[in-house]
Amino acid sequence: MKSAVSPSLVRPVHLVPSQRAALSPLFEQLRTELRGDVHADRASRGRYATDASIYQIMPLGVVVPRDQDDLRIALDIARDRKIPVLARGAGTSQCGQTVGEALVVDNSKWLNRIVEFDARARTVTVEPGIVLDHLNAWLKPHGLWFPVDVSTGAQCTIGGMAGNNSCGSRSIEYGNMVHNVLAIDAILADGSACRFGSLAQPVTDRRTLDLLHGVERIATRERDELVERVPKVLRRVAGYNLDLFDCQNPRAYTDDGHANLAHLLVGSEGTLAYSRQITLKLAPLPAHKTLGVVNFPTFYQAMDAAQHIVKLKPVAVELVDRTMIALSMENPAFRPVIERALVGQPQAILLVEFAGESRDAQLTQLDRLAELMADLGLPGSVVKMTDAGAQKALWDVRKAGLNIMMSMKGDGKPVSFIEDCAVPLEHLAEYTRRLTEVFHKHETEGTWYAHASVGTLHVRPILDMRRDGATRMREIAGEAAALVREYKGAYSGEHGDGLCRGEWVAWQYGPRLNAAFAEIKRLFDPDNRFNPDKIVNPPRMDAREHFRFAPGYAALPLQPALDWSAWNVTRNPLTGEETEPGSGTDITHGLASAVEMCNNNGHCRKFDAGTMCPSYRATRDEQHVTRGRANTLRLAVTGQLGADGLAGADVKAALDLCVSCKGCKRDCPTGVDMARFKIEARHARNRTHGTTLRERLVAYLPRYAPWASRMRGALAFANGMPVVAPVMKRWIGLAPQRALPTFARPFLAGAGAASMPAPDPQAGSITREVLLFVDTFSNYQEPDNARAARAVLEAAGYTVHFNVRQGERPLCCGRTFLAAGLVDEAKAEAKRTLDTLRPYLERGVTIVGLEPSCLLSMRDEFLAYGYGDDAARLAGHALLFEEFLVREQAAGRLSLPLRALDGTAEALVHGHCHQKAFDAFTPVQTVLRWIPGLKVSPVESSCCGMAGSFGYEAEHYDASQAMAELSLLPAVRARADGAIVVADGTSCRHQIRDGAQTQAVHVARVLQRALQG
């Protein structure tokens, strides 16, 4: 029985239209006739000028169609005006398939519906922009999935996967896209609509029949050449699948033996037709999975063992080499995961997965794997993982492989150009050994990972594409190609042709088949309108004018406000050694190099409830995702958006919805920290344009809060007046829907002069002393939080000091100044804090904070002020309230007499973005679980959307609410009766109060309630 799904799986919120500018007649027509987005400005085009490859070509413009009617209108206009068209999904191509001088049509924002689903037939029809992981999440309740599980599944689209003929980690079991696409509904270059599918049914449409006859004629004529020239390996994606009538792949394209004309479009990179709907073959979800991690003392042994391991019939065998292991260990999110998989210090590991209906059978397979490795001389080398969570965590590390490797600092980066050559398994060890020798010959090293099961290892030589990288790339490519030919492999095994490998199609297939491909292109697209210069008539791979780092690429001179010297280094590609911070050649002192860490792989285009990236989840706009912002910054700092650099309007617009959540700092494997870049951009803009009244009111809150506290009665009266408050909000630029913060008698006013005595260096043990750093908000607006924290700490037997001295203003983290880009003021606050706390830090006293964004700035931005050892010492002693309690409990120094909470059985916990970014969210849940009988339920949400003053600002209110409605507010409204809501961030609490009419509380307040006596 069929069930059709009309609503989109994800219906994005459209918030910020493209900036209007003087438009050509083409774009005036597009904007007039389309309901979707039309972008013609240079910054928008620049964000679509790159993908995850080394290339950059400015498109003519960008169209984001809202529906199928929009798509057809856009294609009609482009055809009438003789404009080339380039279909784009997630833009994660590593070979430049989605880069070109054309009208880019972005399917990912709106064209993402599930059109039809047949559970019994195990088929689904989707629009091209649907994300793979979204599709599989929707299919999961039906016990089905689409098994071409590529590593970019969280962001890649089905349309892009079909255009690329993607493969995935489990292709040894399920095949490639060509094995799993049943039909494609497409629009041809002449505007006609055709359905390409199985030839088991007669073709009746005249246009489709003409194409079929033409393809059959060419394929029949070239049959002998296809048999002779097409590599006999599973992974082979170069050129067109002209062997669809006489399959040369080791795995048959179809189950019934009938040819399928859709398979000619699969892997065609959008050069033949525009796919509007794709019908897929589904597979049952395996009931159980187990994972064996095999540790190898040498890389060669790992490669040699692959041919033996596949005989055990695993569904996946994936490689992680020593470089990727080392880089994973540097990432705090990945380190504990990878450590659990290691035995000693291996040079390589293989992830071997078994899946099926019988768990016992899989456990037997794991035992057989261990026996096999013992027979191969490696007893005890297998780490068995049967827990689903542990398996997923390790697969997530593997899936992040490219991004992890791209986290290398310095100008040299692993470059994609021979990363998916495929060779028969029996030659894999020798191929990798000899290719490594080629790298060494050219004074570089390669990083290896991925698909050992099918002889397709991703390897990227480390090259500096600013300098001699292009020359060495050409030389290495030639020698690698010779090895591939010797071993009868495929030069393009998985990632397609694009700009990088298009010129090698003729080398792989010879002049006859290359000419046949050109004939196919003319048959479908005689005017060369669909993605020109791909597969047929491609440019040279080393055409430097197409590089992201093109000739003349250079940053504008810039003196940053923060310290970026860690990125201004030189790296030896052979040894991996880095020079000292600040020793590189970056004239921006590391800032440009930090921006260039973004490799465009699109990990930030995730849609789940993790940390990154809330503004993208709300808007689905490339402008408002970390990748889009990084590209905007890169274009700006290199003068490609004009002479204004970071102070320009394009940068301001790109960062407009960035809530500085630091999700990218944690989740981006290359460590792109957009919150820190936003500080720099605001600082640069302030120097040119100054600050607004609203910005100054927010920034200087710590300075005038004492006055506001004394005037709290008058302010509360004014805030409650029905005329005064709205006028005040409108004058300042605040959202009328928001309630203004109220002030209270400051907590520290009662702490007294003795709150911060000069400590005695000769004093005894300091294990029972803490300094409670009461932030501006906890002091002047929510003093009950500070009182609760003091009560809990004193109940646990600690002597509590505070961050204030008699007659002085309390110490401040400077966070509000940072948010406004007033870095000099923030540094001044930090310097005062460091100088005052130095005696405590020298004695090892822990600094405990309540507000995550405040306390955690001491572990983050303070280190970028240039204050050296003082800042590092503070970072090592600064803990959030709950982190401190967990540490003390683990050390056996904490005893809290907690009792059950009357009338409260559950705590719904929302994590502040910075808590998540610094792995500080788990301690909140831990301490709450100390309360007897309390069920602790974390909310699966990203940023609450308030983000300090962001949600108060009139122009950002809608975006703020959209972010909150993604996960947080629905979860709060749906909580069980009597459940309390816990949120440590003051902004989070205000958002929950405004959006769900619920008063959330700080964890300290909950613990105070639970104290006995």
Report residues per predicted region.
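N-terminal flexible segment immediately upstream of the FAD-binding catalytic core
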Residues: 1-80, 90-122, 151, 174, ...
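Flexible, glycine/charged-enriched surface loops at secondary-structure junctions
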Residues: 15-17, 37-41, 88, 147-150, ...
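N-terminal glycine-rich flavin-associated loop
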Residues: 30, 53-85, 103-152, 162, ...
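A glycine-rich phosphate-binding loop feature that marks nucleotide/adenosyl-phosphate handling sites
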Residues: 44-47, 93-96, 152-159, 234-245, ...
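C-terminal substrate-binding/cap subdomain adjacent to the FAD-binding core in PCMH-type
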Residues: 53, 161-163, 167, 171-397, ...
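Terminal amphipathic helices with adjacent charged low-complexity linkers/tails
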Residues: 278-283, 303-306, 310-412, 416, ...
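Ferredoxin-type iron-sulfur electron-transfer modules and their immediate structural context
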Residues: 412, 490, 498-507, 511-657, ...
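Iron-sulfur cluster-binding electron-transfer modules in prokaryotic oxidoreductases
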Residues: 525, 532, 549, 557, ...
